[in-house]
């Protein structure tokens, strides 16, 4: 039986970093490419305003990024709701009671697969009781991997000006390690 832990990487941090870092990387990279005159395409007219090519590129890459994030989330949610694996802290959150009134600590229930039960923990919220069945695939892991791999691949394709190649590789490695840390934290949090 594993205890319930709050998430090491909270939802706020996950979405702030997951959306923020790739977007910052795209803005900075496209602006630098424009300043170094690597993209000398014509400007677009929009309601009488000239839209620089680097802003057009940002719009394109933001769209690709957000579409991919939505697809990743949809795929993860389909997996979560169709498989519905119990989280490792299921017993401490639910404290299941069998139809005969026994619980999991009763020796009669050892080494039995039990499908019919009710949760006896009155203190658990409806949200927590719902989430105890949504262990796999990990939403935190899939979202962080998608966003950070996208950022790393984006930098690989677009950050190709002369200068330090080590900076690009350091940023790519840092992005991937942040996603890896998030995935590992789900294991240590028993999520």
What is the predicted function of each stretch?
Residues 60, 97-191:
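Membrane-embedded catalytic cores of phosphoryl/pyrophosphoryl-handling enzymes
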Residues 1-64, 74-95, 112-123, 127-131:
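N-terminal transmembrane-helix/juxtamembrane module of multi-pass inner/ER membrane proteins
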Residues 26, 64, 68, 77-85, ...:
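Ordered, helix-dominated protein-protein interaction surfaces in large eukaryotic regulatory proteins
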Residues 15-22, 65-69, 171, 175-178:
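Hydrophobic alpha-helical transmembrane segments of polytopic
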Residues 30, 35, 39-43, 69, ...:
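Generic local-structure boundary detector
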